[in-house]
A protein has these predicted regions:
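Two-component/phosphorelay signaling modules centered on CheY-like receiver
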Residues: 16-34
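Helix N-cap/capping motif at the beta->alpha junctions
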Residues: 35-44, 65
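Active-site residues of response regulator receiver
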Residues: 57
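Receiver (REC) domain active-site loop signature in two-component systems and cognate sites
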Residues: 60
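C-terminal output helix
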Residues: 109-119
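CheY-like receiver
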Residues: 123-146
Length: 146
């Protein structure tokens, strides 16, 4: 991902050390990062702010990653969510993708790969927003009989 556009990212992981390290590394690359340690906090943050990508750990106490994914997608179907896990299984990845995750990566994640996925998520979000704007404009023009 190039530095021309700063992405806004929400990191969700119950492992505090991992969360702090990844946050710092992403911020050094020009991203604006919010970090939380639970699914509950992630759901609240996702309602209050608009993120280009939400990176969620699959295995967390309380509300796990899949439930966090479901609840965020219920509130914001266009949210771009990347799932992370230290215990990846093909079945978990399939389930996350069925629930609307844009991608699924295994820890330890390569920073370059994560940056690429964040860039893709931001690009996809921008395309969705452009399409929605075009559709709204089309409806306005039709209502005015232009």
């Amino acid at each position: 991902m190039e530095k021309e556009t700063e992405a806004k990212v929400l990191l969700v992981d119950d492992e505090q050390e991992f969360l702090e390290t990844l946050s710092s590394r992403l911020e050094l690359r020009g991203l604006k990062v919010s970090a939380v340690t639970s699914g509950e906090q992630a759901i609240t943050e996702a309602k209050q702010q608009d993120f280009d990508a939400i990176i969620v750990d699959l295995s967390m106490p309380g509300i796990d990653g899949l439930e966090t994914l479901k609840r965020i997608k219920a509130d914001n179907p266009n949210a771009e969510i990347i799932m992370l896990t230290g215990h990846a299984s093909v079945q978990s990845g399939i389930e996350a993708m069925k629930l609307g995750a844009g991608d699924f990566l295994q820890k330890p994640v390569e920073l370059s790969e994560l940056m690429e996925k964040i860039g893709e998520a931001k690009d996809k979000k921008m395309l969705v927003l452009q399409k929605q704007s075009q559709e709204e404009l089309r409806k306005i023009l039709q209502s005015k009989s232009w």
